C-alpha cells in the first residue's frame, strides 16, 4: 500500500477588491444619466410637468457625470449651459439658449497648452424647459403678467458662474475650438465647475449651488418667455458634490 499523503490545507480565497471612489462616481454618473435620458423620452409624451421632472433628472445626471470626469481624470471639469442670447444668425442656434448643456474637462496637451475638451455629447432639455439664469432674470424673459422672485438666496434662480467669449475643443486632437458643435464659434455660458477631488470650486460662498428649471414659451429666433413663476424645479449641489432635488418654486 502506498502511504497516504498528508492533505493540503485549502488555499485561502483572494480578498475581493472593493470599488474605488472614482469607480463608484463613474458608475453612479452613468446610471443617473441613463435614467435622465429615459425620463427625457417619457417627458416628450406627457405634460410640461412631466417634461420638467424629466429635465430635472437629466441635469442631475449631467452633474454626476461632470463630477465623475473630474475625479476620474484628476482635473477640472464643468457642466456648461448655452447662454448666448438670441437672435442668432441661425434659428437652430437660438433654440439652444438656456436649453443645451454639455460636460467638458480641462486637459494639458503634449505641447503644454491647457484646453477645455468635450467629455461627451451636448444634451438638450425636453421642450419647453429652460434653465433659469442667475438673478436678476431679465424682464424680457418673462411672459406678460409674470413676475419672478430674484432673491439669489431664496428665489428660484440659478447661482452659476458666467463667462463670455468661451469656446472649447470637441476632441483633444481637434485643430480648432467650437461652441456647442458650431466650429470656430464662441459664446456666453453659465457653468458649474468641479475640482480634481470632486468638490465644487465655482462657488466659494459655502452655500449650495442652485440650478433652477422652468417652463417657457418657445418659438422662432427669439428669447424664451417663462410662463409661470410657480412651475419650477431644480437642484441643490453641495460643495462635496452631493445633489438634492428641489420640487417647488418655494423650495429654493
Feature names for model-found ranges:
Residues 10-11:
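A short, basic/flexible loop-to-alpha-helix module at the beginning of a structural domain
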Residues 2-7, 16-68, 72, 76, ...:
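N-terminal helix-rich module
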Amino acid at each position: 500500500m502506498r502511504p497516504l499523503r498528508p492533505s493540503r490545507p485549502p488555499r485561502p480565497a483572494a480578498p475581493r477588491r472593493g470599488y474605488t471612489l472614482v469607480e463608484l462616481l463613474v458608475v453612479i454618473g452613468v446610471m443617473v444619466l441613463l435614467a435622465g435620458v429615459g425620463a427625457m423620452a417619457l417627458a416628450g409624451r406627457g405634460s410640461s410637468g412631466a417634461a420638467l421632472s424629466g429635465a430635472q433628472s437629466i441635469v442631475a445626471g449631467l452633474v454626476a457625470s461632470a463630477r465623475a470626469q473630474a475625479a476620474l481624470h484628476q482635473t477640472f471639469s464643468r457642466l456648461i449651459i448655452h447662454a448666448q442670447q438670441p437672435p442668432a444668425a441661425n434659428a437652430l442656434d437660438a433654440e439652444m439658449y438656456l436649453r443645451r448643456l454639455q460636460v467638458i474637462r480641462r486637459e494639458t496637451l503634449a505641447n503644454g497648452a491647457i484646453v477645455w475638451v468635450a467629455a461627451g455629447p451636448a444634451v438638450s432639455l425636453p421642450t419647453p424647459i429652460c434653465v433659469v439664469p442667475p438673478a436678476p432674470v431679465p424682464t424680457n424673459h418673462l411672459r406678460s403678467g409674470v413676475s419672478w422672485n430674484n432673491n439669489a438666496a431664496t428665489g428660484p434662480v440659478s447661482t452659476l458662474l458666467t463667462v463670455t467669449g468661451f469656446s472649447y475643443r470637441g476632441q483633444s486632437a481637434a485643430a480648432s475650438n467650437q461652441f456647442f458643435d458650431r466650429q470656430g464659434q464662441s459664446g456666453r455660458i453659465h457653468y458649474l465647475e468641479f475640482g480634481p477631488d470632486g468638490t465644487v470650486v465655482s462657488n466659494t460662498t459655502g452655500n449650495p449651488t442652485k440650478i433652477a428649471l422652468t417652463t417657457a414659451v418657445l418659438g422662432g429666433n427669439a428669447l424664451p418667455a417663462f410662463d409661470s413663476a410657480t412651475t419650477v424645479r431644480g437642484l441643490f449641489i453641495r460643495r462635496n458634490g452631493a445633489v438634492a432635488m428641489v420640487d417647488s418654486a418655494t423650495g429654493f
